[in-house]
Amino acid sequence: MKIISALGLLILFSVSCNSNGDVVLDEESLQKDDSIGIKYFGNTQGTTYAVIVNDEIELLNREIDEILHQFDLALSSYIPNSTLSKLNKYSAGVFTYKDSLSFFNRCIEQSRFVYELSSGDFDPTVYPLVDGWGFMKNVEEIPDSLAVDSLRALLGFSDGYHFKFNYVGQDSVYNVTKKTPNAKLDFNALAQGLSVDVICELLEGKGAKNYFVEIGGEVRVKGLNSDGKLWTIGIDKPVEKSNALNRVLQEIVQLDNKSIATSGSYRKFYEKNGVKYSHTLDPNTGYPVKHSLLSATVVANNCALADGLATAFMVMGPNKAVKFIKENQNLDIELFLIFDNSKGRQETYMSKGFKSLILK
């Protein structure tokens, strides 16, 4: 359900200010700055990635690109021959797939965990609903209530409902029983976070202890930056029509061995007949959310969880999200919300642990 513009987060060790005094990332200078560790940049999953390592390890750029390419071949909904695309186009019955690197199965398992944890507010079967509202094609379509009801009948990620996955395979070959022909999966709300975790596992396997990994705005860090300090991350202030050149920071946090992901609705919406329609769809109703939450930032131990929960909180809204955090303190996650109050003014909520992360 993450149809938002990525990069709700900004790394701050190489920044400049534009004419308005806003902080912006100077990526060109970052690439040229030899004092900032080993740097890798590239494109993946329809977005960009940045990997910075402050340890002496062997060059990894080809390995990173190959892993992310294989990740796309497993989970991209835009590559026609990806495992996910083939499953979505499959009519019904037993679908067989090869998952040598376990990317597909890991995404299924992580997605089901967040789906159950959020009581369905995070739902990877939302693809038909997103498509029905025109968000897949970037067209403004408002389906009638009958269409919404028929689309909602295709939702639900409980095991065996629309899909029954068999995790016992041979020679990395697995199968899934697709029970509903028009049911489709969309892992956009969690896959980028999972790909961050995968790259971090690669780095740690090479002995890296100090690194920064960012893919599409989802971030995981460990250890220290080139200045010997904790990694510093900025969180965008929700401003409509903002971009990398005019962004304003709401808060700055310092992290070690943590992941951070932000999801928001303030950049992605369309307006028709004076009504704004958010691109964040509630799978429980089939309609765009109407609450006042503008962005949700989650800090967690792994990026897949942070990514998925950030999307779930955008569906929940501020009150339900705060209740969730208070009732699930065993998860070791922290939350930062930005929302409009009843007077239309922005307010924030920080979990107790999040407050300790703020750069003083």
Regions of interest found by a model, annotated:
Residues 1-15:
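Sec-dependent bacterial lipoprotein signal peptides
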